[in-house]
Amino acid sequence: MSGMNQVVATCWTCLLLSAFLCEPVLSKGGRGGSRGSSRGSHSRSPKAGGYRGGGPHNGGTRGSRYRGRSSPVRVASAAAAGAAVALTADKWYASAYRRSKADGSDEELDYYNRTNYFDAQMSSSTQNGSSLSQLVSIIIATFSPKYGLLMDSIL
C-alpha cells in the first residue's frame, strides 16, 4: 500500500472517530431530542411532532419531521466505509494479480507478502477470535504491517 493511501485512510479514520465521539445526539440520554427533557416526556407544544395526535391532520408530522436532516455521523460513516471498501479492494486486487502472474518477479512477491496478512485476516473461515480483536488487528496492520504481525501473534 502506498504512503498516500495510508494518509487518506488515517484521515478518514480520524474524521469518523471525531464525528462519532463528538456527536451530541449520541451523548444525550432518552428520547428527548432538542425539545423537552431527556427522559422522554412529551413536549406541551402543539408543533413538537404530533406524538399525541392520531388523526388525519397530525398523522404525517412525526415521520416527516426528521427527513432531510443528515447527521455528521452518517456522512462520516459513509465516507469511512467508502475508504475501507477502496482499501480492501486494493488488497484483493493485489492478491488476485499476484496469483495470475507466474513469472515470480521479486517485486510482485514482496507486494504479495505485504498483503498476505490481510488475506488471512479477511478470511473468516480460519479465524476463531473475537471480531473486535480482529478489527483492532486489521486497523493496526493497515498502518504498520510489522506491528500488525506482532499484534496477531499476541492475540
From Swiss-Prot:
Q: Where is this chain glycosylated?
A: 113, 128
Which keywords accompany this UniProt record? Amyloid, Cell membrane, Glycoprotein, GPI-anchor, Lipoprotein, Membrane, Prion, Signal
What name appears for this protein in its UniProt entry?
Answer: Shadow of prion protein
Location in the cell reads: Cell membrane
Classify the main location.
membrane
Propiece span(s):
126-155
Say which domain of life the source belongs to: Eukaryota
| Residues where lipid is bound covalently (GPI-anchor amidated serine) | 125
